[in-house]
């Protein structure tokens, strides 16, 4: 009995690893975490030298801290009517969809959006539970929500939440203020809150100023980082005075007044329905604290937006917009003027940065507005964490306003939205990237001890290693080339367990269907990230108008040809945008892998097009540019031929273009069209229109364009000399679908790429004395010989087929071939999916026998197959695919234990 339990435990453990061990799942990402140890503390320091070490007293202290944090703190009332001239308010057209009863479709969508594998609330019911039983309980859930609205309150359990404390990175854990409270709320409550959040967020872009970048679709944290970096740079380059005021609100989400939230909702004309729902959600909210594995007593909440509540971020944004309005309407607060563009304020939720002209009046008025907002909202300005830095021509100033406030003046370096800044922009990249390689190496060393395939290591590289750098790579100038080279070396050394690349780097980065494994190319990765800024620059009208004003030439990249990049680079001093241009130029130099068609070039730009030259120079006519004559199609008739000069004058009246100038331009265009039509075009790179089609479609398409070439894996040249007409695309895809087990996937991949070590290879490397087969000891051991040509292996395959025929009378009659054994099902030769698995398991069994230097025997193979099928069954039961498993193996009950299948 005990041995059976142990065997079952081993099987379930293997199934867990196969299912999640090399994928970006919660199980995988938690393998190297020490969450419990990280979330425990042996003592607390009250800050006055008083240490608390007894666990019961620690829990009481934590409860007291949060009970006090969420206690009622009367906020002052203030008439906000004076702000309405600056504000955009909701009207009936905006609010129609905010009212009405909660619908089942809203709840269903909220449930779909909920992630699995998340900690439940106090009642213990998970999102998976609700998803499984929603067809049965959904209608009752919706009724309960609408009944709660009628009664004006929720049930007792729906109000409950457990506050779990997460320590802030890099801050001493013995101080309770350095822990972040996250509320674990019941899923039923979160579904209701999500429905209301879904309604509210649809109107936020209407009322929330573009200076706020938090929690709204189409707004991006990087825009605030970009604004800060470019402001520091331009004030420095153009000798403009400026002052940065970086405000820190203490526990902002947790201390905002409920009275103020209601007042803000009314100010923006939210309907009574939404205001009533807000009151219902917060009316009897109560929590306990989970700390050091213990739970405190329950206590009521009287203020704050609970972190973990789906509606909280949106309620906070509405409150923060009041502050934004107060600052923008105060004309005594003057921002920094950069190239006729005024920069004053940027926010990301509670992260607030003011860009001031440096005058005392602007500073004191800004502080005045902040203090008034603090009094009416319940938020407290954390003076000893609020940082102020002189920038531009004032960066060496010693002036300090309001010294009694104890603000941090001239902090040297300061952190905003995850990026470390300095008033000297040439230091910013070094500050952020120094030490990152050591951090990457430490992460790799933690994973190096695990026996993982390169497929699993690719997952680690993408999710846990490069992710440490992504935020920096998107928002800062590129790190030095030596940094990237060392990073690339470290990553690939980890991937292959040494310096030898067993498969070419360029092949590893390709898609599965092209013989690759979606490995990350760090250089292409950075290009893809940086190119995203060009998409943002062109697709969101108004959002990035700051950069359209600061760097107007950048907005013309999409309408001009590739010859425009070099003039732009000469005129731009910003290292970040210069890097963006260089990556764009790299994208434009991608080689074509298909012939040009005439229709391809109609969308091509006329100006700065390297393929359309007049007197060996690219064309740029300012009148044509101003009149929107930008693309080849703009000077073609309906038959695709160039317009005559008279037709051109009719289409573009009052033109200043002379007949001679027009003839010169049109001859250049006509020559390009004729060359394309006749197949004489020597265009080697992708077209500008193709590049922008990819940029507009998203990062995935940019990445695909960068990988666009006709290179094939080296091993295919050898295989193609041995086999005719193999469908490699089918073979590649099949190898990744043949098994959920990453070990078996990689085993098959090593065969395809001819990197599975045979004795012939080991002998060449002087790692073995003989190249002869471990089974027959008479022929050189190659892949062909090991899996097919060897007499012992041939005998093994015959025994397997014989066993199949004898014990599985209804299974497919299979004619084995060398291609089938080596590569699996190449075409739709048979529909029996179990055969694929049997052949793969058997082939892997042969390989294990080779390593153990024993002859492959059918009885041992059948035992191995039973074990693997049992693991498959466990996997099927965990993923809800038991019926699929049974359909796959039903014909083989005679060969294996019927109980297994």
Give residue spans per PLM region.
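Short, charged alpha-helical motifs in flexible N/C-terminal segments and linkers
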Residues: 1-65, 100-157, 163, 233-241, ...
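Conserved pre-catalytic core of RNA-dependent polymerases
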Residues: 32, 70, 94-322, 326, ...
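Short, conserved micro-motifs composed of acidic
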Residues: 86, 293, 381-412
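Catalytic palm active-site di-aspartate
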Residues: 121, 160-163, 180, 212-214, ...
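Family-specific functional microsites
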Residues: 172, 266, 402-405, 411, ...
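Basic, alpha-helical interaction scaffolds
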Residues: 405-478, 531-543
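Extended C-terminal regions of large enzymes
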Residues: 487, 500-757, 854, 864-901
């Amino acid at each position: 009995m005990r041995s059976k339990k142990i065997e079952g435990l081993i099987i379930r453990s293997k199934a867990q690893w196969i299912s999640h061990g090399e994928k970006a799942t919660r199980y995988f990402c938690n393998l190297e975490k020490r969450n419990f140890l990280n979330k425990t503390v042996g003592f607390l320091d009250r800050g006055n030298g008083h240490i608390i070490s007894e666990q019961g007293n620690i829990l009481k202290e934590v409860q007291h801290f949060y009970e006090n944090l969420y206690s009622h703190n009367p906020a002052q009332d203030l008439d906000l009517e004076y702000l309405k001239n600056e504000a955009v308010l909701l009207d009936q057209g905006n609010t129609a969809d905010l009212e009405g009863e909660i619908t089942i479709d809203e709840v269903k969508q909220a449930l779909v959006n909920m992630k699995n594998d998340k900690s439940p609330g106090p009642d213990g019911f998970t999102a998976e539970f609700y998803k499984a039983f929603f067809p049965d309980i959904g209608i009752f859930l919706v009724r309960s929500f609408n009944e709660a609205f009628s009664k004006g309150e929720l049930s007792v359990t729906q109000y409950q939440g457990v506050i779990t404390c997460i320590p802030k990175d890099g801050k001493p854990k013995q101080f309770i203020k350095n822990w972040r409270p996250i509320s674990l709320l019941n899923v039923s409550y979160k579904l209701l809150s999500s429905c209301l959040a879904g309604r509210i967020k649809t109107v936020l872009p209407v009322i929330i100023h573009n200076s706020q970048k938090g929690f709204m679709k189409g707004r991006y944290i990087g825009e605030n980082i970009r604004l800060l970096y470019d402001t520091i740079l331009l004030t420095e380059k153009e000798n403009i005075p400026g002052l940065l005021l970086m405000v820190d609100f203490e526990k902002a989400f947790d201390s905002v007044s409920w009275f103020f939230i209601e007042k803000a909702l009314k100010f923006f004309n939210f309907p009574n329905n939404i205001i009533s729902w807000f009151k219902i959600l917060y009316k009897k909210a109560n929590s306990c604290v989970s700390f050091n594995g213990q739970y405190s007593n329950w206590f009521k909440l009287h203020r704050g937006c609970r972190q973990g509540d789906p509606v909280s971020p949106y309620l906070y944004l509405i409150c923060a917009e009041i502050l934004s309005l107060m600052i923008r309407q105060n004309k005594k607060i003057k921002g920094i003027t950069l190239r006729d563009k005024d920069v004053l304020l940027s926010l990301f939720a509670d992260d607030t940065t003011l860009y001031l002209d440096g005058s005392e009046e602007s500073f004191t008025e800004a502080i005045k507005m902040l203090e008034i907002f603090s009094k009416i909202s319940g938020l407290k300005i954390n003076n000893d964490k609020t940082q102020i830095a002189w920038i531009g021509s004032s960066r060496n100033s010693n002036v300090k306003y309001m010294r009694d406030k104890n603000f941090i003046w001239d902090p040297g370096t300061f952190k905003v939205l995850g990026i470390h800044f300095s008033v000297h922009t040439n230091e910013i990249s070094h500050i952020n990237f120094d030490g990152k390689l050591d951090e990457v190496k430490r992460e790799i060393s933690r994973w190096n001890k695990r026996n993982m395939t390169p497929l699993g290591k690719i997952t680690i590289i993408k999710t846990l290693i490069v992710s440490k750098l992504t935020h920096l790579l998107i928002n800062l100038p590129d790190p030095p080339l030596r940094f990237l080279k060392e990073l690339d070396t470290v990553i690939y050394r980890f991937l292959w367990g040494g310096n030898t690349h067993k498969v070419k780097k360029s092949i590893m980065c390709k898609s599965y269907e092209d013989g690759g494994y979606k490995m990350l190319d760090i250089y292409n990765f950075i290009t893809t990230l940086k190119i995203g800024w060009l998409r943002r620059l062109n697709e969101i009208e108004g959002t990035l108008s700051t950069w359209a004003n600061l760097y107007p030439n950048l907005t013309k990249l999409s309408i001009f040809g590739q010859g425009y990049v070099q003039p732009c680079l000469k005129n731009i001093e910003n290292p970040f945008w210069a890097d963006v241009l260089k990556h764009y130029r790299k994208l434009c130099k991608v080689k074509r892998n298909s012939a040009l068609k005439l229709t391809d070039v109609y969308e091509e730009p006329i100006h700065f097009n390297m393929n359309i030259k007049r007197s060996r120079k690219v064309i740029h006519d300012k009148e044509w540019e101003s009149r929107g004559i930008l693309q080849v199609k703009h000077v073609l008739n309906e038959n695709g031929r160039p317009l005559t000069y008279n037709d051109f004058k009719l289409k573009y009246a009052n033109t200043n273009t002379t007949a001679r100038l027009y003839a010169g331009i049109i001859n250049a265009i006509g020559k390009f069209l004729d060359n394309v039509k006749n197949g004489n075009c020597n265009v080697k790179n992708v077209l500008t229109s193709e590049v922008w089609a990819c940029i507009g479609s998203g990062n995935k398409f940019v990445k695909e364009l960068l990988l666009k070439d006709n290179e094939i894996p080296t091993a295919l040249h050898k295989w193609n000399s041995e086999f005719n007409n193999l469908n490699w695309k089918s073979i590649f895809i099949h190898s990744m679908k043949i098994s959920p087990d990453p070990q078996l996937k990689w085993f098959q991949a090593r065969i395809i790429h001819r990197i599975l070590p045979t004795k012939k290879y080991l002998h060449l490397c002087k790692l073995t004395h003989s190249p002869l087969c471990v089974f027959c000891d008479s022929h050189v051991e190659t892949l062909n010989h090991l899996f097919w040509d060897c007499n012992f292996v041939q005998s093994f395959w015959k025994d397997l087929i014989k066993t199949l025929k004898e014990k599985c009378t209804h299974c497919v009659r299979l004619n084995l071939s060398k291609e089938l054994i080596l590569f699996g099902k190449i075409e739709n030769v048979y529909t029996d999916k179990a055969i694929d698995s049997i052949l793969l398991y058997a082939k892997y069994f042969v390989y294990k026998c080779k390593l153990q230097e024993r002859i492959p025997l059918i009885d041992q193979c059948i035992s191995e197959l039973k074990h693997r099928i049992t693991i498959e069954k466990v996997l099927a039961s965990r993923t809800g695919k038991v019926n699929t498993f049974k359909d796959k193996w039903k014909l083989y009950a005679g060969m294996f234990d019927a109980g297994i299948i």
